[in-house]
Design a protein with these regions (language model features):
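N-terminal leader/linker segments that initiate helical-solenoid repeat arrays
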Residues: 27-84, 324, 328, 333
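Hydrophobic face of amphipathic alpha-helices that form TPR/SEL1-like repeat modules
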Residues: 63-64, 81-86, 113, 117-122, ...
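Short helix-capping/linker turns of helical repeat alpha-solenoids
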Residues: 67-68, 72-74, 106-108, 122-124, ...
Length: 333
C-alpha cells in the first residue's frame, strides 16, 4: 500500500494525533513499515469494539501499544481504546487505569477525559465523586467533546454536583440539540413531558418533534417514547395501532424495554389482534433481559391461564422475580 492511500484509508477513522502521524508517513514513505502495522491494529481494534468483540480488540492493541515508533498522541489513543473495552465490560477499575495511562501520553485526550468523568460521576470503579467527574467533563468540553457538554448541561438542569440552574441547563441542552446531539434531544423532550401535561400546544409539538428528530438520528428510545405518546393519547391523538408500530420499530432497533410494551399490547389487544402466545414470547424476551415487566407479565399469564395452563406456582415465582428487579419497562417512558 502506498503512503498516500494509507492516509486516505485511515484519515476518516482516527483522531488528530493519528492524522499528524499519517502526514509524516506521506512525507517519509520509509516510515510506513514502522507505523503502518500499529495503525492497522488500532483501526481493527476499533472496528472490533463496535462489534462488541472486546477481548479480541485488546489482542490487536498488543504489542503495537508499546511500539517505539508511534507518537505520544497515538499511544494515548491505544490506551483509551483499551480502557474503553474494559468500560464496556463493566471492569471499571481496569478501565480507569488504562484511561489514566492515556492521559500520561496526551493530557488533552478528550475521550479519555470524558470516560474518566463518567467513572467518577457515577461511582464506577472509584468512590462516587461528582465534582471530580464534572472537572473531567469540563476539560473534555474545552476540547469540544459533545457528550461531556451534555453531562454539564444535564447537571445544571437537575443540580447534580453544581447549583441547579434550570434555565442555563435547558439553554445548554438546546444548543446541543441544534448540533444534532441525540441524548440532548431525548432529555429535553423527557424534561418537558415530566413538567406536566398542562402545557400549551407549542410545547406538545416540540416534544413530538424532538422525539422524531432523535428517531431519525437512530435512537430506539425515541421510537419507544413515541409509542408511549400515541398509547397514552395525552400529547397527541391516541392511536393504538401507530403506538404498536413504534414499539415494534423500537424493538427492531435494539430497545429491550420495547418487548414489554409489545407483549402488553398483544395480551390486551391494543392496536393489534389479541395473541397470548405471541405476548408470552415477548414477555420471555423481556424477562431474559431482567426487566420487571417481563416477569410480571408472565406471572399474569400463568395466574389467569392466558395462552398457557393455569399454574399458580409459576405465577407466584414470576411475580417474585419481578418484585426483585428494579426495572419496569412500562414505567420508564
Amino acid at each position: 500500500m502506498r503512503a498516500g492511500s494509507l492516509v486516505l484509508f485511515f484519515n476518516w477513522r482516527l483522531g488528530l494525533g493519528v492524522q499528524i502521524i499519517l502526514l509524516w508517513i506521506m512525507i517519509s514513505p520509509a516510515a510506513v513499515a514502522l507505523v503502518g502495522k500499529p495503525l492497522q491494529d488500532l483501526s481493527t481494534a476499533e472496528m472490533l469494539v463496535l462489534n462488541d468483540d472486546l477481548t479480541l480488540a485488546r489482542r490487536y492493541l498488543h504489542p503495537s501499544i508499546y511500539s517505539p515508533h508511534i507518537s505520544s498522541k497515538l499511544r494515548s489513543r491505544f490506551y483509551y481504546v483499551k480502557g474503553y473495552t474494559f468500560m464496556k465490560e463493566g471492569l471499571h477499575v481496569s478501565a480507569g487505569k488504562e484511561l489514566y495511562r492515556a492521559l500520561e501520553f496526551d493530557a488533552s485526550n478528550p475521550d479519555a477525559l470524558y470516560c474518566l468523568g463518567q467513572l467518577y460521576y457515577h461511582g464506577r470503579g472509584y468512590d462516587e465523586d461528582v465534582q471530580m467527574g464534572l472537572s473531567f467533563f469540563r476539560e473534555a468540553a474545552d476540547f469540544s467533546h459533545q457528550d461531556a457538554k451534555f453531562y454539564l448541561a444535564y447537571s445544571l438542569l437537575i443540580g447534580k454536583g453544581t447549583e441547579q440552574n434550570e434555565e442555563k441547563g435547558l439553554s445548554a441542552l438546546s444548543d446541543l440539540v441544534a448540533d444534532g446531539h441525540v441524548e440532548a434531544m431525548m432529555h429535553l423532550a423527557n424534561h418537558y413531558r415530566k413538567t406536566g401535561y398542562d402545557q400549551d400546544r407549542e410545547n406538545f409539538d416540540r416534544i413530538k418533534e424532538l422525539y422524531e428528530r432523535a428517531l431519525k438520528a437512530g435512537s430506539p428510545e425515541a421510537a419507544l417514547s413515541l409509542g408511549v405518546l400515541y398509547k397514552e393519547g395525552k400529547l397527541v391523538a391516541k392511536d393504538l395501532g401507530l403506538a404498536f408500530q413504534y414499539f415494534t420499530l423500537a424493538s427492531d432497533m435494539g430497545s429491550l424495554q420495547a418487548d414489554v410494551h409489545i407483549a402488553h399490547s398483544l395480551a390486551a389487544g391494543l392496536g393489534i389482534k389479541r395473541d397470548y402466545v405471541a405476548a408470552r414470547r415477548h414477555y420471555l424476551e423481556a424477562a431474559d433481559n431482567d426487566l420487571a415487566g417481563g416477569f410480571l407479565g408472565l406471572g399474569y399469564l400463568y395466574e389467569f391461564g392466558l395462552g398457557v395452563q393455569i399454574d399458580l406456582v409459576k405465577a407466584r415465582a414470576f411475580y417474585d422475580l419481578g418484585a426483585g428487579t428494579s426495572s419496569s419497562a412500562l414505567n420508564e417512558n
